[in-house]
Amino acid sequence: MLHDPELHYLDNAATTIVAPEVAEVIDKAMREHWANPSSLYAPGARSEEALNAARAAVARTLGCKSKELYFTSCGSEGNNLALLGTAQTRTFGKGIVVSGFEHPSVQRPLERLAAQGYNVTVVKPQADGTLDINKMLDAVDKNTILVACMMVNNEIGTRNDVERLAAEVKRRNSRTIVHVDAVQAWMRVPIKLDNIDTMTVSGHKIHAPKGIGALYLSDRLVQAFQPPYLGGEQERGLRPGTENLPYALGLAAAATRLAGSIKSRDKAVRALNDRLRAGLSVFPEVEINSPAGAVPEVLNFSENCIKSETMLAWLSEKQIYVSSASACGRGQPSHTLAAMGRDPLAIDTAIRVSFCADNTPEDVDAFLERFEDGMKHLQRIKK
């Protein structure tokens, strides 16, 4: 998608470049579906029909009913809606169990609930970056109203077995709500909603624009759902505000575009990840933070020499674009690496490279070349 051969974008976990065909769908929708979908006249009816079609298309990729799919502005909004909108509907207990490396949009709503008297149990990841599902299950009891666990970690790429987690949670307490943040997983790994009650996805991680996402909310929870904010009856009254129809159509186009190619894209991206791992293996200082079973789209490592911000600035000057941690935690050290027990030097020198299927071996080679130059040059300056 990039036309500049000297520019190498390797930060796809932060955001992806909008696909040209998705941009075309949005542009067309802005011109043709300008009416409010709630309006009763003919243009409004056509907009409503288009919105329903977009909803159905996105729902198909998740394997849910159209009426269980709600458009949001992003994954963060979806997480807030899911957590704050369901927790207070459960009156049989105050227990909440959550993994220790969730996105801030999961952490902070749960911190608010903790301040309101809920008992939040945080299960830290293991030293290798994996999550012990059994430890989460051990924390579930008759008073547990909610369990939250991301499917793929946004910083190190850990893939969590949320299907097993959800099934086992329901066996222990069928009334417990299971929430899954699938923002980094959607269109990267297969998704099954069995035993999962709420799930969030986001458009800008799959080559749709920023500003559009979706929340899956099991139909059995709708009647008791308490939306955090109130307004009109859009999205069945659960997410008020005039719908962003052009972006909803763009989300549907992006999801449909990728839905049939998960396996082939996984193979292509895995080859890039392997190439990068092999290239990094020649640096004795480098320590890989991503666990062996991580999704291939994300490779996090610490170079244990140069502060991340310094190395990122060097690479950016060479048009190599990567990151040090989650874009949503800008300027903050990685809470994921801290939860894993990494030492301060490893945290301060961490770099995240994240791929999409549009990346090439040349992107990897360019990164490795500029990274090697940076290690030599910046260490000389440091001395």
Regions found by a protein language model. Give the residues of each.
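Pyridoxal 5′-phosphate
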Residues: M1-K383
